């Protein structure tokens, strides 16, 4: 009797395994398709510049405000380049961070510290650390290229009155500060609305919100506020953008290590 029961059990197990594998594959494919559609919102922008305000908000509600200038450059076939330069307050004036995002290779980042008058390369294993006391990490300041993650589609749900795709993405970089990220992308424009970041112990570390989107040149979407709430320490950081301009004629020369020192 036992022999007769083995074969149907094996068949049922194989059917279940096949169904599970197919389901996972379809989920991964759908998650990737959604991520690619979202990424296309930035195709062809060439370059952009903006003025930024960074607010550091303590658990008690105390606020420290910093002013920056930010510019970025589209690099066909690779990740984008960006340069952020602090203008105030005095203790961070002239500090600059240069980022070269790459589609599959580790990103390159350099930090210019005017007090030391030198450019410091940020090692890949240190990019999960906080950026100048904010709740943003060096990793957060680099562009999130599609190719750097594995994806799974989770579900569709309503968020802030918008129907959103909810996907999971897992960083492929072994030095990432995150084990996974849950991303809400609206189904109308495929804009990222919210990200839950999970730390290396798989606890919910931070919640990132993308607010006040505007479209430029009828083609390029820009959030005018990005909020990073730390769920573990109660602190928050807010980036606000103004004077956003596209197609300024920026070139690679504007994003070199020498440009870090010139940007003071």
What are these regions (language model features)?
Residues 71-73, 152-158, 212-213:
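Short amphipathic beta-strand and strand-loop transition segments with alternating hydrophobic
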Residues 29, 147-156:
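Long, terminal "pre-/pro-" and other extracytoplasmic accessory regions
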Residues 22-30:
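Bacterial Sec-dependent signal peptides at the C-terminal "C-region" and cleavage site
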Residues 12-23:
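Bacterial N-terminal signal peptides
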Residues 2-13:
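Bacterial N-terminal signal peptides that target proteins for export
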Residues 30-115:
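N-terminal mature ectodomain segment of secretory-pathway/periplasmic proteins
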